[in-house]
């Protein structure tokens, strides 16, 4: 571990929901939930206002609606999120050549490698400037953690949320970690946490007191050694600029459990086709085919088959997935299916296992038939044209966003990022004056080229509560405020 807190972890605050609030003035300060809106949908992100009601990521959407019935429920706009993420990553790469993205809204940065930080004061200044730059460029807020290791930097950014900065100064790690829950440490999920709790271990300090031998006895050699090292704040993992893709997969959750075995098989074939398209799009091939099945009782089964060599052949992957399905009992119904490929390699013309063209045609036929059947089960085209939260433009009323649609009608609120909360109007779903539109920028450029957050004067739009804590450091002194 380093002797200076020069590893930075950035985590954007409620990213998807904050983007929606920044682009929709009427939702600022309101509960917003982004995710799949069907009966089997899952929450992708909840704004801080929604979290007050107990809504959180990965929660079933039905449960979220019961907890926060008056929240705004929106369909994700991934192209917009990705474009904003790219601007944030550009700011990070300006700090250092060693940037390790973890997702669209999260990354590690090695500040020392970029020469912008070498001790606590310089690291803190870099963190403060980064947060200000993110506000100026995107209009959003992010939380920053600084420490001598990746593990601690991530823990620090979590403590900084929302819209804060936390520095864990070298020498203070053990004292800081000691009283924290064992669940704070990476790799300690509900099962491991319960196992440790039954052994009387609930805090990080109690892990240290139990000793390495006891942890190995409880958790096994690899997990026990690793967890003990983390409890001692030992983490020498470097920031890696390019994270290697380990697998490619697709999965679907179904609004109604699938009971018919033939339908399950056709779904698996369709998912295999989608997986191949994604695999080829990335220029990859793989040798291990993985099938994921979540049953009616939420139990999840995973089956895999390793081939003799890498392939991107759709027939091979379909047939392997079908063989894997043969070993799974789907009695009672299936709520989720997934097909993936791991053991990846660069694209290869490998066709050792390719089947005859006639066999491919037979295999592809049912997929096409199922696609037609599935289309009949989907919502009407008119309803699918207007997903909640997406941008539209009306020839008379201008730019707006969809509040909801159904029964042949679509309701639109007409407002832009730099306007006051707008008026609501309802149209027929086939209104010729209404069309889908591209998102508007969250930050306007002034005459001097500088960024200005719409509707917020010189300050950034922030969706977090007004009363925020000051950020803190391991030594308890010299803290920067969480609002630059």
Predicted regions and their residues:
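Intrinsically disordered, low-complexity mixed-charge segments
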Residues: 344-370, 437-452
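Short coil-to-beta transition motif at edge beta-strands of beta-rich domains
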Residues: 380-396
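Gly/Gly-Pro- and Ser/Thr-rich, intrinsically disordered tail segments characteristic of DNA damage-repair
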Residues: 1-225, 368-379, 387-388, 468, ...
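Intrinsically disordered, low-complexity linker and terminal regions at domain boundaries
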Residues: 413-484
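DNA-contacting surface of Y-family translesion DNA polymerases
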Residues: 2, 184, 192-336, 341-349
């Amino acid at each position: 571990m380093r002797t200076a807190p020069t590893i930075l972890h950035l985590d954007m605050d409620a990213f998807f929901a904050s983007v929606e609030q920044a682009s929709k003035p009427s939702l600022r300060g309101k509960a917003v939930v982004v995710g799949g809106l069907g009966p089997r949908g899952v929450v992708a992100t909840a704004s801080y206002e929604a979290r007050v009601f107990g809504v959180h990521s990965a929660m079933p959407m039905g449960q979220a609606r019961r907890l926060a019935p008056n929240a705004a429920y929106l369909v994700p706009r991934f192209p917009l999120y990705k474009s904003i993420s790219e601007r944030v990553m550009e700011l990070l790469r300006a700090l250092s050549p060693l940037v390790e993205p973890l997702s669209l809204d999260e990354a590690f940065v090695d500040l020392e490698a970029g020469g912008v930080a070498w001790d606590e004061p310089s690291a803190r200044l870099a963190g403060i400037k980064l947060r200000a730059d993110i506000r100026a460029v995107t209009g959003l807020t992010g939380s920053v953690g600084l420490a001598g290791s990746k593990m601690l930097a991530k823990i620090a950014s979590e403590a900084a949320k929302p819209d804060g900065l936390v520095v864990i100064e070298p020498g203070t790690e053990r004292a800081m970690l000691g009283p924290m829950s064992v669940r704070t440490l990476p790799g300690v999920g509900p099962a491991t946490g319960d196992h440790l709790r039954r052994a009387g271990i609930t805090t990080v300090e109690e892990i240290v007191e139990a000793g390495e031998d006891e942890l190995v006895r409880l958790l096994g050699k690899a997990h026990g050694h690793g967890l003990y090292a983390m409890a001692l704040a030992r983490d020498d993992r470097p920031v890696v600029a390019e994270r290697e893709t380990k697998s490619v997969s697709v999965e679907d959750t179904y609004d109604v459990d699938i009971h018919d075995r033939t339908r399950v098989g056709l779904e698996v074939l369709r998912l295999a086709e989608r997986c191949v398209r994604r695999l080829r799009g990335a220029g990859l091939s793989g040798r291990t085919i993985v099938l994921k099945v979540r049953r009616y009782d939420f139990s999840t089964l995973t089956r895999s088959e390793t081939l003799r060599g890498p392939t991107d052949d759709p027939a091979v992957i379909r047939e392997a997935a079908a063989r894997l399905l043969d070993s799974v009992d789907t009695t009672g119904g299936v709520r989720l299916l997934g097909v993936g490929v791991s053991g990846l390699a660069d694209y290869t013309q490998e066709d050792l296992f390719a089947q005859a063209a006639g066999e491919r045609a037979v295999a592809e036929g049912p997929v096409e038939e199922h696609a037609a059947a599935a289309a009949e089960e989907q919502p009407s085209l008119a309803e699918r044209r207007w997903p909640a939260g997406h941008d539209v433009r009306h020839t008379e009323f201008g730019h707006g966003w969809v509040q909801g649609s159904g029964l042949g009608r679509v309701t639109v609120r007409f407002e832009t990022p730099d306007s006051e909360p707008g008026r609501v109007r309802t149209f027929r779903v086939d209104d010729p004056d209404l069309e889908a539109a591209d998102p508007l920028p969250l930050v306007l450029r002034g005459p001097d080229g500088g960024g200005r957050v719409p509707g917020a004067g010189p300050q950034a739009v922030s969706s977090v509560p007004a009363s925020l804590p000051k950020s803190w450091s391991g030594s308890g002194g010299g803290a920067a405020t969480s609002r630059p």
